[in-house]
Amino acid sequence: MNLVIVQYKISFVHLFKNKNMKYPKKLIFFIAMLVSVSPLLAQISVSGNVIDQDGQPIPGVTILDQEDNSNGTVTDFDGAFTINIPSDGTLSVSFIGYVTQNILVSGQTNINVTLQENVSALDEVVITGYGSQIKKSDLTGSISSISSEDFESQPLIRVDQALQARAAGVAVTQTSGAPGAGYKIRIRGANSITGNNNPLYVVDGLVIGNINNINASDISSMEVLKDASATAIYGNRGANGVVLITTKSGSKGKAKIQVDSFFGTSEVVQRIPVMSPAQYAAGVNLRDGVETISQSRISELSAGGGADWQDYFFRSAPFSNIVVSANGGSEDVDYYISANNYKAQATVINQDFNRLNFRTNLNAQLNDKLKVGINNFISRSENTGARANLATGIAWDMNTPPRDSNGNYNSAPLVSGVGNGSPMPLLGPENNRVENISDQLISSVYANYNITDNITLNISAGVEKIDLTNSRYTSSEVNGVTEAVVRDQQGVRFQNTNRLTYKNDNPDHAFQADIVHEQQSFEMNFREATASSFFSNSTNFKELSLAGIQNTDSGNSNEKLESFLARINYSLYDKYLFTASVRAKGSS
């Protein structure tokens, strides 16, 4: 699929001239619009390899056109890449843990790059789970860290997109071409053939079941815990790896409002090659050995009759993403607020996606010892349209026009024995409609209390509420029987975490110990109604009472988990590192 993106960025900066953050006497708006248009320069194909200081190839390195960030690629397992770029353009070569290089193309068609390790990155602080922070140089486990600076210039829709080609050892593949479709994340390979291989997602310390609706622009950083040492603190839930997500907080100083947006279209540029209707008709005669289709009909098809069903399946699909955010604060209080709307059509007709979300993060330093905060997130996504059977439709009889002379779907071939119907009913929402709605609420609070200079108590609690409604309607035009299904699911997840931390930053004997107590509960309820044998096709899944056959079902499930955890990190002379953790849990 070919993706064409035009990006606009608008920033509004509020300047406050008033002490103690009272209501301002003067409010100054500064508006700046940057419209980035790539110049129409000669494009050349540039190939090369990316290696490290030891001459080993580096897979997954991001290669971008510095002037057009929507034009990019990643290196393969051999460190090789190919990209089309203006002859006087600049390549940006980046990978986690290495220094980014910007290379002038200057008409070169072969460019090899050697990346240098980013030594200063070892002093960066990373989150290792349950709010614990240590320097990268003190890590004994395998952790990949990604900050918002690594992807904020990219037109990302989903959080899991940010991991693609940015976290070493993490395989990210898209599950579907449908708008809003998720990504398959594999951190420690496929541990199960039929079971769940997805990693555990933790957002601001709260275990989350669904990250599909979270806005990528709200992310401050992500840490990926990969090996057994890093994931042990989460027990068997971390068997497939753990992704720790930290959302943005406000910055001290003047309030700032920012609007970011991008727009574009998606198109299928390489269709399945098929014969023309006239070639298909001639092939039928050749297959049958007789003139099944008359020469006069073949002449009509050559003049423009018949149909290539792909012309009816595919379309140019527009999409747009708009993010409005505000942040600011004083010495003691900071805030971050954002709203996001993403709309997209699928390249297959009659399929649409719409997502809205809103976030507020507030932190307050009440005194020298106590800091509190609250994070709220609410979202709704709607995926509507018709299910299209492309594989079957493409192979359908091309001699049959989509509709008959009365404008109805043509479900019978013109010539007996040639084809057996029309795929058009599979595309019409009046005959085959699907509607999936997801509502999500995430709310969490925390309190940090410094008992002494070395001992800190952290108490946090959070809840995630998910409501899912999946509806499907299929008329008798599709499979001979009118059917409808409506399924509602409600899930509530609660978590309370209490952590006591002792930390000594002595350069010769750095020591940190954590003791954690955690309680979790998850409850899921569902209701399902099915209906068939409707008295008329002019119905949908909202009129189940008009069906001759009706059935209902319901159920619920409950899970509870209580855990105790102890973890020690010790660094001797900044050379010898020791990490140990033990976890005990009970579940019901």
Put a short name on every predicted segment.
Residues 185, 243, 324, 358-360, ...:
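Membrane-embedded beta-strands of outer-membrane beta-barrel proteins
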